[in-house]
Swiss-Prot record:
Taxonomic classification: Archaea, Methanobacteriati, Methanobacteriota, Methanomada group, Methanobacteria
Family: Belongs to the universal ribosomal protein uL13 family.
Annotated source species: Methanosphaera stadtmanae (strain ATCC 43021 / DSM 3091 / JCM 11832 / MCB-3)
Keywords attached to this entry: Ribonucleoprotein, Ribosomal protein
GO annotation (BP), single: negative regulation of translation
Protein name as annotated: Large ribosomal subunit protein uL13
Gene designation: rpl13
Oligomer status and interactors: Part of the 50S ribosomal subunit.
First and last residue of the signal peptide: none
Molecular functions (GO terms): mRNA binding; structural constituent of ribosome
Cross-referenced InterPro entries: Ribosomal_uL13, Ribosomal_uL13_bac-type, Ribosomal_uL13_euk/arc, Ribosomal_uL13_sf
Amino acid sequence: MVTIIDGEGLVLGRLASTVSKRLLDGEEITIINAEKIIISGNKDFIYAKYKQRVDRASISNPRDLGPKYPRRPDDIFRRTVRGMIPYRKAHGRAAYKNLKVNVGIPKELEGQEVVEVEQAQPKNITKSMELGTVSKLLGAKF
């Protein structure tokens, strides 16, 4: 059975750590509304950090040489989770394949039961930015 989690209003790092633990336990997880996941912190600092990562590609041949960092919100979340699991080992790669991330709510998932993640709820966050906003600033089209 697939666990569906709505990412709207949840904190990126807390949600990613919870999801990575569940993936390593063998669950299949689908995240919806990835563009509404929030990143806590100063907006200028958040944008500068992600912009630096995207611009870090090789000068000589940026299409072929890495590191390649994503711009889309669903891919940014997948990359965050990937950093929390041993994706180069067999069990980590198998766990990573059980993660599906969607922008918005796909038609086949409408009306299905959504699991609440209490650990990822924001607590006393005054400065934050949504993943969708970061992606648009980085030039993503989704």
